[in-house]
From Swiss-Prot:
It comes from Synechococcus sp. (strain CC9311). The gene is miaA. It holds the Pfam family IPPT. Residues 49-52 are annotated as: Interaction with substrate tRNA. Its EC number is 2.5.1.75. This is tRNA dimethylallyltransferase. Belongs to the IPP transferase family. ATP binds at residues 24-31. It catalyses: adenosine(37) in tRNA + dimethylallyl diphosphate = N(6)-dimethylallyladenosine(37) in tRNA + diphosphate.
């Protein structure tokens, strides 16, 4: 694991370039702070949010708007259609190339997002299994239903299952795909080979996170989550794994008559709050961010980055 306390020694600048990562749970304010930091230091933003890698999933993922992307150049957004899954290994390869290019051009790279596993793969050199997507197997798993799939994973690879939420169809299917294709559980196939970067992790974890999540959920429904979900369902079918993820799953139930919009908003809020709790646990156990705890997160982050650039 990259440790912050050893990054900024007297010779650190000569040894390796600096990668700054702004992390934290959903609705913690990462997007707004990332834009301010990028503008202050004249940086570009590299996305590490797993759902924002997909095109046509804008509202439900709180993807940076067109106006925000005009303010600051973003990378690693809209890489594929939502019916073309991106494996962790594929993300790692694409993101490593993007980081290397930005470092070459600007001397510092700036990551922002809430997907801890993707951050770990990129900054700690996690080596995921090289198993390509298996379309037929995924169709079979989808037909079983997510509850059965997660139960299968608990039996076959309890270590991997413990790290995946029961409702997370995308990661559950991927873990089973790796297991059935290679004969080895995913948890036994991951090693690390850290890249030659210094990594400064900055974390956001506001006290009012629960109310921020409730406000964010209401906002995405008001902005058109139901219509976005309708279009995705019509184009790719209602069994699309990405339509089982938080927000889209509840919106799909509204469209199918299973939930009222008010019920869907309440369920999405609850699921997001549960997910945010898991995100905080992940960042606490798997990373060592400087938590921005002061009243002025921007000034605190600027000071830490300037020290890193030193």
């Amino acid at each position: 694991m990259n440790q912050i306390n050893s990054e900024f020694g007297p010779d650190a600048g000569a040894k390796a370039p600096l990668v700054v990562a702004l992390v934290g749970p959903t609705a913690s304010g990462k997007t707004a702070l990332a834009l301010e930091l990028a503008e202050h230091f004249q940086l570009e933003i590299l996305n590490i949010d797993s759902r924002q890698l997909y095109r046509e999933m804008d509202i439900g993922t709180a993807k940076p708007t067109a106006e925000q992307q005009q303010r600051v150049t973003h990378h690693l957004l809209d890489l594929r259609s939502p019916d073309q899954p991106i494996t962790l290994q594929e993300f790692q390869q694409e993101a490593t190339a993007a980081v290397s290019q930005v470092l070459k051009e600007r001397g510092v790279a700036f990551l922002a997002g809430g997907s801890g596993l993707y951050l770990k793969a990129l900054t700690q050199g996690l080596q995921p299994p090289a198993v390509p997507p298996q379309a037929e197997l995924r169709r079979q798993l989808s037909s079983l239903g997510q509850a059965n799939c997660h139960q299968l994973l608990q039996q076959a690879d309890p270590q991997a299952a413990a790290k995946i939420a029961p409702a997370d169809a995308v990661r559950t299917q991927r873990a089973l795909e790796v297991l059935y294709s290679s004969g080895k559980p995913m948890s036994a196939q991951q090693s690390t080979n850290p890249p030659p970067w210094r990594v400064l992790e900055l974390g956001l974890n506001p006290m009012e996170l629960r109310s921020r999540i409730a406000q964010r959920t209401l906002q995405i429904y008001q902005e058109g989550l139901l219509e976005e979900t309708r279009q995705l369902s019509q184009r790719y079918g209602p069994d699309l794994p990405m339509l089982q993820t938080i927000g889209y799953g509840e919106a799909l139930e509204v469209l199918q008559g299973g939930l009222s919009e008010a019920q869907a908003i309440a369920t999405t809020t609850r699921r997001t709050q549960q997910f945010a709790k898991r995100q905080r646990t992940w960042f606490r156990r798997q990373h060592s961010p400087h938590w921005l705890t002061g009243q002025d997160a921007l000034s605190e982050a600027i000071r830490l980055i300037e020290a890193g650039l030193g």
